[in-house]
């Protein structure tokens, strides 16, 4: 997981990324720093979350450099800048845009706290597919989710000719403004058993971009021991904290 910046053009209530101090939000990892981290890690798949990666002034260079290294890149985006940014990229089997969508129009716009985001994201998805790009969606399910509405949403996504759908429970962010919507383990199992029942029975052939073992984990049918090295993450957060600490020591009155 490569996080070249934490800035975003949305303020989603279930996300704590933009709550970082200003010094951290100003940071952009250089393409060279990104390449060095990816080469050191050695993982074949690189997910680029945010903030909003398309705000990075050199995101096209970062993505192309990773593709040149034969890395499978999942560029996460809320879709607001995607359509006008497509000209910066070239369709490739190594590049997938992963568009954040947490439900149909009313639900998604509520989650991102801005009207019109859903429609703009859908338009961007269609434009990207028309130009030959791979596109998946990334959905977070929170505690107040209605299982039937989530199923309707998955049916809607299935008609968009996507290259896959990703879904995840709402994991806790310490700094997120809304702390009430995150799911505990037992809530997660009960909710996903209901949501995924049509998929489990074979009634709905939803095209999830997941190992089925993960979906079984969500439903509580299996369990795993997590490891901190299971998904290595690299960002400018540690560097920014070091610089801020140094600045405060050198300029104590600021």
Model-derived features with residue positions:
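Short, acidic/turn-prone active-site loops that include or flank metal/cofactor-
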Residues: 79-80, 101-105, 250
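Short, charged, surface-exposed secondary-structure boundary motifs
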Residues: 85, 107-111
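Short, surface-exposed charged micro-motifs
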Residues: 3, 233-234
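Glycine-centered loop/turn positions within well-structured domains
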Residues: 10, 106, 232, 241, ...
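Radical SAM enzyme [4Fe-4S]-AdoMet core and its adjacent flexible, acidic
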Residues: 29, 69, 98-102, 110, ...
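Membrane-interface junctions of multi-pass transporters
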Residues: 223, 246-254
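Conserved alpha-helical substructure of the radical SAM core
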Residues: 1-88, 92-93
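Short linear motifs in exposed loops
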Residues: 85, 244-247
């Amino acid at each position: 997981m490569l996080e070249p910046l934490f800035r975003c053009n949305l303020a989603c209530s279930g996300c704590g990324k933009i709550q970082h101090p200003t010094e951290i939000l100003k940071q952009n990892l250089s393409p060279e720093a990104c390449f060095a981290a990816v080469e050191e890690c050695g993982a074949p798949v690189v997910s680029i979350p945010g903030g909003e990666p398309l705000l990075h002034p050199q995101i096209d260079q970062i993505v192309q450099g990773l593709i040149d290294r034969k890395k499978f890149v999942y560029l996460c985006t809320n879709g607001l800048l995607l359509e006008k940014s497509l000209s910066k990229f070239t369709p490739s089997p190594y590049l997938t845009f992963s568009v954040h969508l947490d439900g149909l129009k009313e639900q998604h716009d509520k989650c991102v706290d801005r009207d019109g985001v859903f429609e703009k994201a859908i338009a961007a998805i269609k434009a990207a597919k028309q130009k030959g790009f791979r596109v998946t969606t990334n959905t977070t399910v929170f505690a107040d989710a209605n299982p039937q509405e989530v199923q309707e949403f998955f049916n809607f996504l299935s008609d968009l000719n996507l290259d896959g759908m990703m879904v995840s429970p709402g994991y806790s962010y310490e700094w997120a403004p809304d702390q009430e919507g995150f799911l505990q383990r037992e809530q997660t199992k009960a909710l996903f058993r209901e949501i995924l029942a049509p998929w489990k029975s074979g009634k709905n052939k939803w095209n999830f971009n997941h190992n089925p073992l993960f979906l079984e984990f969500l439903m509580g049918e299996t369990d795993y021991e997590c490891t901190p090295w299971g998904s290595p993450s690299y960002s400018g957060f540690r560097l920014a904290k070091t610089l801020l600490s140094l600045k405060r020591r050198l300029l104590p009155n600021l």
